């Protein structure tokens, strides 16, 4: 079923009829027919980046928009948010790795930190899972509230 969705989605994207997708393809400098790689590593992260840094509606507005000027503005902002997300992700991952003791005997890693950006802790948890080959739960603590992602 997922393959069918991806195949159909690629057909739609290749047609370049959606102004937002077309604009994002231009911003990403994708000049060939988009592939699964482009979806997973270039387009998808940018569309999701707004939600990760607090601008939840940007991705949807880009995909639904009909105005070239506002589509370009949204695509440019999403591209910038994606760069910010990458920096936040890299910084948090490095911070955790620098502070992490030897967890080789622990079956699960459960780590928490004050004010870790909740939009990226899931991505960082996935990176740590790959590095340590075990389940990882990260908890961002703000005041007396914790938000977790695994």
Task: Give the positions of each predicted feature.
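Hydrophobic helix-and-loop "lid/oligomerization" segment in the mid-to-C-terminal part
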Residues: 1-150
């Amino acid at each position: 079923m997922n393959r069918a969705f991806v195949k159909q989605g690629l057909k739609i994207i290749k047609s370049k009829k959606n102004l937002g997708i077309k604009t994002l393809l231009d911003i990403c400098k994708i000049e060939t027919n988009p592939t699964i790689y482009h979806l997973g590593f270039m387009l998808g992260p940018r569309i999701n980046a707004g939600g990760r840094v607090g601008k939840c509606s940007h991705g949807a507005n880009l995909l639904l928009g009909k105005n070239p000027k506002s589509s370009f503005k949204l695509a440019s902002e999403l591209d910038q948010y994606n760069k910010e997300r990458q920096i936040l992700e890299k910084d948090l991952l490095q911070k955790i790795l620098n502070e992490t003791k030897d967890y080789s005997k622990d079956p699960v890693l459960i780590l928490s930190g004050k004010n870790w950006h909740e939009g990226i802790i899931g991505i960082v948890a996935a990176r740590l899972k790959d590095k340590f080959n075990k389940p990882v739960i990260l908890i961002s603590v703000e005041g007396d509230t914790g938000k977790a992602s695994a």
